[in-house]
Amino acid sequence: MYPAHLLVLLAVCVSLLGASDIPPQPLNLYQFSNMIQCANRGRRPTKHYMDYGCYCGKGGSGTPVDELDRCCKVHDDCYGEAEKSQNCAPYWTWYTWKCGSDGPQCDDSETGCQRSVCECDAIAAKCFAKAPYNDANWDIDTETRCQ
């Protein structure tokens, strides 16, 4: 084997070792993001919902700050119910849906866990599209406002 080949092989191995420390992203969040874009017809980027209020984004506590934040709390609760009643892993559950004229629609062939998680996401995406967005509630200090 040529020395150049060994260097390339070593570089690939080192790259893979470094990548193993990066946590995988939940597959479902990609679908949920697309559902949000379907529901709001691309009027607001999905990232604007990732750190909003007390419940939009990772975790959640306290009282929702507004209607949009309530949508996120309902979504969190819906995922919690799917975990309990369907023994689901909502963040990892892949489902089939389409973007219709009324917004996201879950495929009728989906049942059980996939159906539950899809409905949680579709309902939340439609709720996001209807709720007003208050820039002052993005990236708030959750330690003081979400008790």
Curated annotation (Swiss-Prot):
Propeptide positions: 20-27
EC number(s) on file: 3.1.1.4
Tissues in which the UniProt entry reports expression: Expressed by the venom gland.
Gene Ontology annotations for the cellular component aspect, listed alphabetically: extracellular region
Subcellular localization: Secreted
Region forming the signal peptide: 1-19
Details of cofactor binding: Binds 1 Ca(2+) ion.
Binding-site positions, Ca(2+): 55, 57, 59, 76
Pfam families in UniProt: Phospholip_A2_1 (PF00068)
One BP annotation, GO: arachidonate secretion
Main localization of the protein described in the UniProt heading: secreted
Active site location: 75, 121
Keywords: Calcium, Disulfide bond, Hemostasis impairing toxin, Hydrolase, Lipid degradation, Lipid metabolism, Metal-binding, Platelet aggregation inhibiting toxin, Secreted, Signal, Toxin
Annotated catalysed reactions: a 1,2-diacyl-sn-glycero-3-phosphocholine + H2O = a 1-acyl-sn-glycero-3-phosphocholine + a fatty acid + H(+)
Disulfide bonds: 38-99, 54-146, 56-72, 71-127, 78-120, 88-113, 106-118
CDD domains attached to this UniProt entry: PLA2c
Enzyme class: hydrolase
Cofactor(s) this protein cannot do without: Ca(2+)
Record SUPFAM superfamilies: Phospholipase A2, PLA2
GO molecular function: calcium ion binding; calcium-dependent phospholipase A2 activity; phospholipid binding; toxin activity
Role according to the record: Snake venom phospholipase A2 (PLA2) that inhibits collagen-induced platelet aggregation. PLA2 catalyzes the calcium-dependent hydrolysis of the 2-acyl groups in 3-sn-phosphoglycerides.
Alphabetical list of PANTHER family matching this protein: PHOSPHOLIPASE A2, PHOSPHOLIPASE A2 FAMILY MEMBER
Family per similarity comment: Belongs to the phospholipase A2 family. Group I subfamily. D49 sub-subfamily.
Listed name of the protein: Acidic phospholipase A2 S9-53F
